Amino acid sequence: MTRITNSPLDKRSIHAVLCVCAIALLAPSAVHAQLFTFSKQELMDYTAQEPFDRLPDGRPKVPNDLMERARELSSEEVWAVLQQKGFNNQYADGFQVLHPGKTLVGRAFTVQFMPSRPDVDDIAVAKAKNSGLPRLTNQTAIDMLQPGDVLVVDLFGKKVNGTIVGDNLFYYVMKATGGGGLVVDGSVRDLNGISEIDMPAYCRAVDPTPIGNVMLTGINIPIRIGSVTVMPGDLVVGDREGVYFIPPQLVKEVLDRADEIHIHDEWTKRKFDEGKYKSSDIYSTPTDPKLQQEYQEYLKRRLEEIRKQRSPK
């Protein structure tokens, strides 16, 4: 039995917890984690390496200050750490990028759809009716979003009737997440209206049809976006090139490594500006021992400056 304590949750958090509990009632106990949602304990089990606090639904809660730092990341900086750690399938591209001038950063709230199948769909409808709950739709998941979330949706690349939101629901997602964002392996509709709403989004296509001929089969479970397995609570970082899904346990290391890469690029360009060196003298590693020492001293000084700037006043 799920127990709700007197912990200080805001109304939206309580609503999200209740929605998760309600959806769990619709699924057979042996497979509900596969079909509809992970329990809080299952989320904790599958993300046991994460070092942070957790959201009420059990997802890792990457701290807000680290999410702000992530807005300065580039795809290359994220890749440097992930490939070193053996996470080679964390990047998805090939999207239409809406509002490409805005960086997408937030915690993954994952949603899975599958093509409609009448016998399975009929059972889900019957279970919902018997439980006094409405039919499962895209809005079932959307209404569970919290501030800082990015809505990440596996709609299996569907274009026609694969539109997760139009401009009205896009606006709601923006308000509910605080401008977090949207990534959908599917489509959106009402592009003219969406273009006026200040939230980053990534989709495969734009189509005028409403969502249809699909079944909602998972909320906050592992999903597939392109070649990526996305876990609930992954840090989602998107730029003009594509989207990275960073495991929470690697976020701090990615950010610290990015600082070093920024400083290295800064120093390299300064040396090129002097006009005294060939590219191979400086990049990617200085050949002269004196230049190597100069760089190490520059790196140490700049890291100290950056850390001082970030420390609480």
Which residues does each PLM region occupy?
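Bacterial N-terminal signal peptides that target proteins for export
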Residues: 2-19
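Bacterial N-terminal signal peptides
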Residues: 16-28
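Sec/Tat signal peptide C-region and signal peptidase I cleavage site
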Residues: 29-33
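N-terminal pre-domain segments of enzymes
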Residues: 34-79
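Feature captures the catalytic cores and cofactor-binding loops of soluble hydro-lyases/lyases
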Residues: 73-77, 81-232, 246-294, 299-313
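Channel- or pocket-lining gating/hinge segments that regulate access to a cavity or pore
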Residues: 242-244
